Curated annotation (Swiss-Prot):
The active site is at 312. Keywords: Iron, Metal-binding, Oxidoreductase. Binds 1 Fe(2+) ion per subunit. One of its GO terms (biological process) is gibberellin biosynthetic process. This is Gibberellin 20 oxidase 3. PROSITE patterns: FE2OG_OXY (PS51471). It is an enzyme of class 1 (oxidoreductase). The lineage of its organism: Eukaryota, Viridiplantae, Streptophyta, Embryophyta, Tracheophyta. GO terms for molecular function: gibberellin 20-oxidase activity; metal ion binding.
Amino acid sequence: MATECIATVPQIFSENKTKEDSSIFDAKLLNQHSHHIPQQFVWPDHEKPSTDVQPLQVPLIDLAGFLSGDSCLASEATRLVSKAATKHGFFLITNHGVDESLLSRAYLHMDSFFKAPACEKQKAQRKWGESSGYASSFVGRFSSKLPWKETLSFKFSPEEKIHSQTVKDFVSKKMGDGYEDFGKVYQEYAEAMNTLSLKIMELLGMSLGVERRYFKEFFEDSDSIFRLNYYPQCKQPELALGTGPHCDPTSLTILHQDQVGGLQVFVDNKWQSIPPNPHAFVVNIGDTFMALTNGRYKSCLHRAVVNSERERKTFAFFLCPKGEKVVKPPEELVNGVKSGERKYPDFTWSMFLEFTQKHYRADMNTLDEFSIWLKNRRSF
């Protein structure tokens, strides 16, 4: 069966027709059949990756120290977070409490999905306008500047855990027998990330001078997204990008990288890298949390590069508010601004998600463009 699936895939893209999508990105076949990547994956010269990229200085935050009750450790953690989040929104979390064996199992299980035949992965195909499922380079959604990657995304709502296991159930429904352990591992991982995200929200609340539990309570009921990112080897990495320049529209991203590296952040008018640290999670502020802070904390432009030697794997947990919860900053973060101005209108996450899924390709202007779109929509 696997041989038959592969045999039906043309040299550039497979044309496996479905109701939702008409094509699939298959890097293995592209590398086998051509010395050049298709034009759809070639980025403009001004966006092509640079070979001269220096590491970004990002603080290491001792989360266990912050939570220990030691006022000195808590003060240092909030100071470091505030400085980083005000400038570029990126920091590293160490002593995070996530079991290293869970991380090992999570990486181990990625190959069972992403190295399966294209027709097998298609069982979990992501539908247009939805955030769950398999996506191959956004082929079908976009026709140029395609990212050299595959993803598998899951919705995660912690309050549903009592009634169902959202990640595990999605895998079971879409992939069927043979993926039980796969579903269990990523269900456990998503739950661990949700727990970690709420601890980080306590830290962010204190660093902003609001009540410590304010943001934690805001996100206790949430509609988050958990994503597996797989970046295959690329014969011409100097022409392509694994993920194009963008700011995350979500509230908070918790990323774990394998040892390969590829994350770059645009700070001080230049691209800088964040090298892998197996014992730390990379955390960055997203557009929605920037709005919650009235622009005080920054959502920064970043991208992922690829290479010709090794595949790259990452896990990203995107913390998002409950869909219909109104996103607006606490009064302390409005009154502290000159003339008490609001930088962004009230909105809900479901509105913002719809905008990024159906109307706008995320970049550095997503939140501003959404604000304009929202005002125009409300004027009718």
